[in-house]
């Protein structure tokens, strides 16, 4: 935040409907225990620490209070299924927040929900190459990779895995619709310079 760059973060919903900031699909890597965020209530999550630190999984509202509009936020909504409860929770948490923010998701249904209920919020479609481990039907994986589900979410921008920027679907979208595109995740200057030819901006690690 001190450098003025936007912050990308991921949100998930707990078993009792609280919206927390947490990246991974499971808690194994960061907390050392099995299960997903949605398997626990927020109170139960407070027994776990992040890595070797004393920090705990924060609520979205706590992060919003810390950032306090100093830099823009790019908020990824983790929505693995059909339930839009996390979207409704996101809307509630963002009410009254005066800082700049936009949302993104791999799930086109999350974009559609936000388009209907938060029409002033910019929406981004995340995509890239999907594997069998993603537990998504083959046809849906192909359609998502080639951005063939954009008619559902009608994204304002694309956030695409830069390693697969030669994907026909991505190239066609760029040529025909000229949808602004973010490259993810850029980890060094060499990759950044290479992605500048095909993308408008980058989501990077520091």
Where are these regions (language model features)?
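Short alpha-helical
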Residues: 14-15, 81, 109, 165, ...
């Amino acid at each position: 935040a001190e450098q003025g760059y936007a912050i990308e973060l991921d949100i998930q919903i707990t078993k009792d409907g609280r919206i927390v900031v947490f990246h991974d699909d499971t808690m194994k890597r960061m907390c050392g225990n099995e299960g997903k965020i949605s398997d626990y209530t927020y109170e139960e999550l407070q027994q776990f620490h992040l890595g070797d630190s004393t920090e705990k999984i924060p609520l979205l509202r706590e992060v919003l209070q810390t950032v306090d509009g100093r830099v823009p936020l790019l908020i990824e909504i983790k929505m693995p299924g059909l339930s839009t409860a996390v979207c409704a929770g996101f809307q509630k948490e963002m009410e009254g927040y005066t800082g700049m923010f936009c949302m993104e998701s791999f799930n086109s249904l999350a974009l559609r929900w936000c388009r209907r209920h938060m029409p002033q919020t910019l929406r981004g479609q995340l995509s890239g190459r999907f594997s069998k481990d993603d537990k998504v039907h083959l046809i849906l994986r192909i359609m998502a990779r080639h951005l063939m589900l954009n008619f559902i979410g009608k994204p304002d921008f694309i956030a695409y895995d830069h390693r697969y920027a030669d994907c026909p679907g991505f190239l066609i979208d760029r040529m025909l619709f000229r949808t602004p595109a973010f490259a993810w995740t850029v980890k060094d200057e060499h990759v950044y310079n290479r992605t500048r030819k095909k993308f408008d901006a980058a989501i990077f690690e520091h």
